[in-house]
């Protein structure tokens, strides 16, 4: 009836068979097309770059992003699961440069822009097969046959439409600003790109002496960038601070009073004055490499000057700092720039011409020392930005750049951020919220090649025009090709006729930030507004997005920024932020450290379900995950192995009895354990729904895992004998029907989490019996919660019962007494449970008698004392009195409250002190002859004295266990009858004779033979040797 379970087949091979089944039956496509009339649930897949290989972090994002859409499809929603590829930008260009053996813009120009663009286009799908293989293998269901691709003309056209909207709102402008600039890539970067490349670096900062004109005095200034000193044009102070003139080592120096500790050696303050008195003081320039016109080299005010570091006087080079530039513009101080766009000193800087500026730092410091204008140099650790793609030190550099005026949208961005649900919630006001609060204008343009061209044309008369569609380009362009490709260099050949002077207009040379591409995917993937307007409107905003935490400064931000400008709202309602995947020791994975785990290897060795389940349960998704194969193996054993064993148990016995649950579809069991597990199942349905609806993935997985543990180690364990009965009586039918229905619905609940194993079980358990059901579990509906089947009192009592049993097992382990050894009595601190539960406790723990509501203090030694490192810090002198107060309290009651995470208040000398689990240390152990275990307010005590009668019963249970193990090891079928042989221990033979009827029943022994001459297995029965043999009867 059922397919026989092959226990030799690995889970990995089973998953590969399921992949083939899905492929053969086109299950994935059918899932995509399901619920056509259902309400939309929208999930956006953040586009990865396919010219890089997937890593284990991508597995985490994919298993999280797969779970919620699977669940929503089962709930009846229409879910678009469109894959996407991020294909533009520096990541692609750098890989192509590397493959061609060239580096930098001059070599690209020499190679040829058109050929370079073709290479970029050809390269973007280099690793797409690996991405697809990994996604399929992990069970990540998105439509990769019809993905959105950011280099596609339709996609770019939608971006042009967006840029035209931004232009029309007067939010897109060109400015000459000091911007973060990569000298290797030759382009400015945006603030969100810069934020991803910061590193803590140790560099040399210098304190330098600027001589005041016509006086033998020096202004002491500090800088962390000595290379900018040849471009110094001013010194900036804060006019509200107090400054002093000191004599230090024979020199007159001026600095902020609050930073006098920066001086070396002894000093004498000769004058104190407000910073305002320094304004306008002129000083001698340190270098004269670059000529300029206008007034410079005098002291000015800047609010940004602080007393945190340095001297309270800042060297100011307007070419290389935004604050410096603003300050100098305000005072009409000219800007000089002696650095090339490659980050090297120009020829005019004769001592260091051609040197990369950072490499020139040591030489400049040596020069300062030689000229006696270096006061001191010291190492300084600070956070500095590097290019997020090529890792080159960024410079702050003056460039003509196109900006989106995001500063004007700050209030709306904050509003939309607050209106979005963030998981965890602290992202709202923390990492993302703070970034939005400090938002600056988006440096949009890139002086590169492979990207969405900025659709702005300029005329020499100064007129500019932004184009918002291909249609508009054809209407206004001159000789636009029918098959125009919207990339450089082709689009650069398109000219427009100027409306003002009627001359030809040329497109500006820049492309745009590739993060604008990915942030435009909500509408650009549908070619909105040119097509699919209704489809877009039904799927905007998204109900769910999820990516790694670094996307708070990347994709999450650009999604929010663009949708706020265009649609005045966030493009997503719920954002689940994921932590990074670390190695076994909590270290970041890197090739350099040799601790990188390949997704392909992990999936081949451990399987997709085990990997998925580990990521769902290891920690909250937003926390870092320590990922290593042993942990995944443990995950497989604990959950998947347990679920599989329950399924195997059912199939084994149902097949023996030829039990068909469809013949008993209306059967209702009155068995208490059956009612309990059905009640727990329905509670689980409701709990899991609530968790998944609120994106509490870890809690949802944990509740399923706990249920599987209870199903195996409680329900099946308690009910095994019902399945062993030979007759298919009503009680046995109830057990079969219950376990079948539980497994069926449990697999539906677990299907979004572990899609492979649940499919395997469904195929054999459900589809093999009923061809009228869906052909895959992933085409089924989510099970309905039935309140009428929930008995909360039953669940509560059973939970307490199970807890007591686990405590009893713990106490036995502590006393080193096997569960097969009967004990006389157990005392339990909690109130009396109904008699049924008492019978369960006695049976499970092999106890003759139990007593509820017992006072355990007579059997337990309590040791409760203050945790001195905690309490001592706060109440040091009171500790003796605190100890006295603790010892005067009911120790059992106090321990129960503290273990239950309650707070107990005491008063010492009018001071109220709160005692809790953090500031108290509690140890409890049973007195001689007793074993104790406790959890929260529940405690138990076992009487551990073993009488001769109890010992005899213990021997019987050991003998039964050995016989059952021998049956299993001999490969006997469950229903095989046997002959039992025992020998060579009179005492144990008497036990067998006394309980022969019971032994025969439980082991299916037809006959027992004593002391026959044959081969035996020597067994250890509680320290005594006993020979046992079994033989199958044909």
Curated annotation (Swiss-Prot):
GO biological process: isoleucyl-tRNA aminoacylation
Essential cofactor(s): Zn(2+)
Coarse class of the protein's main subcellular location: cytoplasm
Cross-referenced PANTHER family: ISOLEUCINE--TRNA LIGASE, CYTOPLASMIC, SOLEUCYL-TRNA SYNTHETASE
EC number, as in UniProt: 6.1.1.5
Substrates-to-products reaction catalysed: tRNA(Ile) + L-isoleucine + ATP = L-isoleucyl-tRNA(Ile) + AMP + diphosphate
Subunit architecture: Monomer.
Family that this chain belongs to: Belongs to the class-I aminoacyl-tRNA synthetase family. IleS type 2 subfamily.
Binding residues annotated for ATP, in chain numbering: 591
'HIGH' region (motif): residue ranges: 48-58
Pfam families named in the record: Anticodon_1 (PF08264), DUF5915 (PF19302), tRNA-synt_1 (PF00133)
Biological function: Catalyzes the attachment of isoleucine to tRNA(Ile). As IleRS can inadvertently accommodate and process structurally similar amino acids such as valine, to avoid such errors it has two additional distinct tRNA(Ile)-dependent editing activities. One activity is designated as 'pretransfer' editing and involves the hydrolysis of activated Val-AMP. The other activity is designated 'posttransfer' editing and involves deacylation of mischarged Val-tRNA(Ile).
Motif 'KMSKS' region, residue numbers: 588-592
Annotated compartments: Cytoplasm
Keywords: Aminoacyl-tRNA synthetase, ATP-binding, Cytoplasm, Ligase, Metal-binding, Nucleotide-binding, Protein biosynthesis, Zinc
Chain ranges passing through the membrane: none
One Gene Ontology term, aspect cellular component: cytoplasm
The name this protein goes by in its record: Isoleucine--tRNA ligase
UniProt remark on domains: IleRS has two distinct active sites: one for aminoacylation and one for editing. The misactivated valine is translocated from the active site to the editing site, which sterically excludes the correctly activated isoleucine. The single editing site contains two valyl binding pockets, one specific for each substrate (Val-AMP or Val-tRNA(Ile)).
Coiled-coil regions listed in the entry: none
One annotated GO molecular function: tRNA binding
